[in-house]
Amino acid sequence: MSSDEYLQNNNALAVFCNLPTSAYVFNKNGNYFDLQHFINSPEMYESNLYKYMSSTNMLISAHYWDPKSPRLFAKKDIEKYNNLKVIGDITCDVNGSIPTTSRPSTIIDPYYYLDRTTLREVNQHDQALAVMAVDNLPSELPKDSSKEFG
């Protein structure tokens, strides 16, 4: 589904939306989004992912992140995103584009849980935010495939 359709989606069906970069960042000067300009000058952009967050239950981030690029959201905003239950940070850039990724998790223990107010790790409970940030996750797929499919 497109980013515009995602924002207008009001049904209870599970849907996914693969956001293009132009949907979640904007040029600070108000100029039209240009991918090459964003790659060369990421500091000239700000995130506007917030407009998607109230509709999002699970956020999966798998993009390259330059430290000069904006974070996708601010830690302090997590409390506002009540629908958000799980963040899967495939990139696992600690304190990077996903500011709730405070440490990597492991294949054996893939999730940790954060209190939405304090952002401290807590035991799992209904209001906690689950974070999956396995730093070697992309390398596990070939390993699993080799075991399962020989």
Question: For each of these PLM feature ranges, what is it?
Answer:
Residues 18-29, 84-98:
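Charged, low-complexity, helix/coiled-coil-prone segments
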Residues 58, 67, 85-86, 132:
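Feature representing long, continuous alpha-helical segments
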Residues 78-83:
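Short, conserved loop/helix-junction motifs that constitute active-site signature segments
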Residues 1-68:
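Dinucleotide-binding/catalytic capping subdomain of oxidoreductase cores
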Residues 86, 91-150:
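Adenosine-phosphate binding glycine-rich loop
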Residues 73, 77, 105-107:
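Residue-level signature of transmembrane alpha-helix interfaces in integral membrane proteins
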Residues 65-73, 98-99:
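Glycine/threonine-rich flexible loop motifs
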Residues 45, 52, 73-74, 149:
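General structural feature for long, well-ordered alpha-helical segments within catalytic domains
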